[in-house]
Amino acid sequence: MERMTAWVHGFVQGVGFRWWTRARALELGLVGYAANQKDGRVLVIAEGPRDKLETLLTLLRSGDTPGAVDLVVEQWDSARGDLTGFVER
C-alpha cells in the first residue's frame, strides 16, 4: 500500500472536481480525501495499491474532469493507514 499526494492546478474549484475525484477513487477502492486549497488548487490524498493510485493519477490528468486541469504534481510515500473512506473536504 502506498500514499499519493497530488496537487491539482487549474480551474478546479466550484465545478464538481472534488465530487468527481471522490467518485473515481471509490470506484478504485481507494481511501483518502480531496480538499480545496486557498490558492485555488485541489489537494488529493489517496492510499491504496500503487496500480490503483496510478490509475487515479491518469484520470486526474485525462482532460475528462470537471473544470480544467493545467498541471498535477504528485508525491509518493508509504501508506500511513490513518484514512477511511474517501471524502470531500
Swiss-Prot record:
InterPro entries tied to this protein: Acylphosphatase (IPR020456), Acylphosphatase-like_dom (IPR001792), Acylphosphatase-like_dom_sf (IPR036046), Acylphosphatase_CS (IPR017968)
EC nos: 3.6.1.7
Keywords: Hydrolase
GTP-binding is among the record's keywords: no
Main enzyme class: hydrolase
Pfam family of the protein (one): Acylphosphatase
The organism's place on the tree of life at top rank: Bacteria
Catalytic site positions: 18, 36
Reactions this protein catalyses: an acyl phosphate + H2O = a carboxylate + phosphate + H(+)
Domain Acylphosphatase-like span(s) in chain numbering: 3-89
Gene Ontology molecular-function annotations: acylphosphatase activity
Family label: Belongs to the acylphosphatase family.
Database matches in PANTHER family: ACYLPHOSPHATASE
Protein name (record): Acylphosphatase
Name of encoding gene: acyP
